[in-house]
């Protein structure tokens, strides 16, 4: 629920926990939110080099392209990044899966470990297999969320106003005469 997400974000910020996330269209915003809330390390994961560069531009400490590092290699790269940053690679990570794709979900699930939290943000229709007893063994949790509640809007607005979240690079102004074309492009 949104309340669970808010609790997770608050706990992560308070503990300055590291964050991992698999990207998508929301990726650069999630990186900014994580950094804005004080995450010690943010790792962005995406198959698109432009999105990875954008995440680095907006605060990701490291990025991983699953096309370059697949399966166990990706996990090893993730561990190396954590070691370089001086944080545990398998304890307490907050993972945000934003793509909604089966590969993104599988990557996120593969990184979930001890006292970690996976927050599913991206919507997808593919089924994914996961051994639920791992949640018990890892004392981990998986949360699904659609967004935050209106009472959190002031905090988000504050991060936008003080520059922790940059909106300008994501906004494009077009004349009203193009509204039909823009709508068609967006849908």
Residue ranges and their predicted role:
Residues 1-69:
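Mid-domain Rossmann-like dinucleotide-binding core that forms the NAD(H)/NADP(H) cofactor-binding site
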Residues 19-21, 97, 120:
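Hydrophobic Val/Ile/Leu positions in short beta-strands of Rossmann-like dinucleotide-binding domains
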Residues 38-39, 56, 61, 99-164:
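Glycine-rich phosphate-binding loop and adjacent beta-alpha segment
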Residues 66, 96-98:
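Short, well-ordered coil/turn residues at beta-beta hairpins
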Residues 70, 100, 175-178:
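Short loop/turn segments at beta->alpha junctions
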Residues 70-90:
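Short amphipathic alpha-helix with an adjacent loop that forms part of the alpha/beta core around
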Residues 83, 106-107, 150-187:
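C-terminal hydrophobic helical "lid"/dimerization subdomain
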Residues 91-96, 116:
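Short SAM/SAH-binding signature in class I
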């Amino acid at each position: 629920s949104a309340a669970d997400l808010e609790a997770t974000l608050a706990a992560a910020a308070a503990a300055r926990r590291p964050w991992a996330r698999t990207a998508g269209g929301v990726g650069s915003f999630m990186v900014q939110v994580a950094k804005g809330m004080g995450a010690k390390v943010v790792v962005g994961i995406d198959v698109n080099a432009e999105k990875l560069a954008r995440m680095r531009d907006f605060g990701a400490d490291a990025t991983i392209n699953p096309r370059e590092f697949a399966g166990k290699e990706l996990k090893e790269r993730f561990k190396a990044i954590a070691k370089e940053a001086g944080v545990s690679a398998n304890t307490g990570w907050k993972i945000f899966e934003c793509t909604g794709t089966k590969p993104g979900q599988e990557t996120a699930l593969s990184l979930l470990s001890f006292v970690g939290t996976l927050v599913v943000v991206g919507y997808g229709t593919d089924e994914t297999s996961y051994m639920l007893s791992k949640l018990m063994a890892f004392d981990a949790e998986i949360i699904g969320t659609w967004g935050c509640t209106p009472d959190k809007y002031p905090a988000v607005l504050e991060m936008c106003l003080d520059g922790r979240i940059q909106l300008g690079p994501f906004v494009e102004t077009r004349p009203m005469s193009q509204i039909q074309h823009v709508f068609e492009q967006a849908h």
